Each structure stands twice: as structure tokens, then as C-alpha cells.
Amino acid sequence: MEPKYQRILIKLSGEALAGDKGVGIDIPTVQSIAKEIAEVHNSGVQIALVIGGGNLWRGEPAAEAGMDRVQADYTGMLGTVMNALVMADSLQQYGVDTRVQTAIPMQTVAEPYVRGRALRHLEKNRIVVFGAGIGSPYFSTDTTAALRAAEIEAEAILMAKNGVDGVYNADPKKDANAVKFDELTHVEVIKRGLKIMDATASTISMDNDIDLVVFNMNETGNIKRVVLGEQIGTTVSNKASE
């Protein structure tokens, strides 16, 4: 079956790497995620990754507790680099040539982010893991994902969620009558105020015609199903459903 998308960016939360522990990095969990990503990669799909850092650090609560916000955000960026290095190692163990590129130069452990080099890696069937956000405070890893997806001309951002199987009109944990959307447009997401990504990330995705697929990553095989075009989760695009 021909993949629906040829080049994708997968956005993982940092908590996804923590497993049942909720914090830190659980290596078996990382290996399980890496195995699934490697299988999709081996089908010929070009893949980039952005991983959050919430399993290790959260800048906003630290700032609210009195830490300088800029310093707090930079600390969080370093957390995303740790996650990127661990994921890259697991992908390498599954035989996938992988590169880590960081927005803040740290040549001893990773390449500096260079768009042209990232594109060449993808064209050579390497996975690229982007770390350190966009290198500036006040920007989320959602914005990083949208910006990098636009820069590498990805067709879709796969928002892999922990236990969340799509986008609802209300919180399904609080409202038994919450309805899941199969499809939405970027404009509808912004108008409804649905918190899939922050506003900056949503606008970048809309302006660059990048599909956004929100799905439950806890079900094995879901990444592959999304890439093959199966209707799971919620797909957000510029095209209204017919």
C-alpha cells in the first residue's frame, strides 16, 4: 500500500518517553517508540522528529516559582536535547541512520541546525531529530515542530498523544457527551479555539498547507496507519471535508 505521506515530522511529547513513570526517561519505552518509527521509515517514508522536554523540565512553572523565564526556557531546551540524543540512539540500534540537529550549537554531541543539511539527510533516508527548540525562549516545541516542518517541506505533522485519540469539542474526561472530530480545517481549529497546538504553530501549519494528524500513540501501529492514510484520530488540513 502506497503511503499517503512521503515526508513527515513526528511531534512527540517529552512525557511519551517517560512511560508509566511520568517523569524522566524510560529506555524500554523509548525503544518501543523507536521500533515503530523505524518500521515506518523502512517503508520509504522520510521522517523528522521534534520531542518536547516536559518529562525533564517545564519552564513556565519554574518561572512562576521565581526563576528568570529566559533561563527557565533555555534549561528546557537542554532537556529536549537529552530526549533527542536518547531517541537517536534507539533508532540507530534499529539500524536507522539518524542525526541530531540542535538550534543551539553544541558540536560535541550534535550537528548545528542547518536547513540544507537536514534536507540532504532526509533525501539520504536518514532520520533527523531536532533539539533545543528554535533556540529562542518563549517559543514552544509545538512551534518548533510547525516551523521545522515548513522548512523541510513536510506534508504532515503527526501529533502523537498519550492516550488521546483525536480532537474533541470538549474534554472527553470531563464531558461524557464530547464528540470527536474526524476532520477539521486549520481555520476551524483557530476559530473554535481548539488547543491542539499554540496559535503560532497553527498559523504556520495553515500558511504552509501542512496537514496535522492528532492520534493516540499508545496503540501500537498507529503511526504506520496514519502514514498509510487510514482514518484514525483527527486530521486537520486546509481542505474542508466534502
From Swiss-Prot:
Q: In which pathway does it act?
A: Pyrimidine metabolism; CTP biosynthesis via de novo pathway; UDP from UMP (UMPK route): step 1/1
- Does the keyword Transport feature in the UniProt annotation? no
Summarize the protein's role.
Catalyzes the reversible phosphorylation of UMP to UDP.
CDD domains per the record? AAK_UMPK-PyrH-Ec
GO biological process, alphabetically ordered: 'de novo' CTP biosynthetic process; UDP biosynthetic process
InterPro entries to which the protein is assigned, alphabetical: AceGlu_kinase-like_sf, Asp/Glu/Uridylate_kinase, Uridylate_kinase, Uridylate_kinase_bac
Q: What class of enzyme is it?
A: transferase
User: What's known about how it's activated or inhibited?
Assistant: Allosterically activated by GTP. Inhibited by UTP.
Predominantly, its location class is cytoplasm
List the protein's name.
Answer: Uridylate kinase
Which segments carry the region annotation Involved in allosteric activation by GTP? 19-24
Query: What's the catalysed reaction?
Result: UMP + ATP = UDP + ADP
Where does the chain bind UMP? G53, D73, I134, G135, S136, P137, Y138, F139, S140, T141
Instruction: Spell out the Gene3D superfamilies in the cross-references.
Output: Acetylglutamate kinase-like
Q: How does it assemble?
A: Homohexamer.
GO CC term (a single one): cytoplasm
Q: Name one GO molecular function term.
A: ATP binding
Localization in the cell: Cytoplasm
Indicate which residues the UniProt annotation says bind ATP.
K11, L12, S13, G14, G54, R58, N162, Y168, D171
The enzyme's E.C. designation: 2.7.4.22
Q: Which UniProt keywords apply?
A: Allosteric enzyme, ATP-binding, Cytoplasm, Kinase, Nucleotide-binding, Pyrimidine biosynthesis, Transferase
What family is it from?
Answer: Belongs to the UMP kinase family.
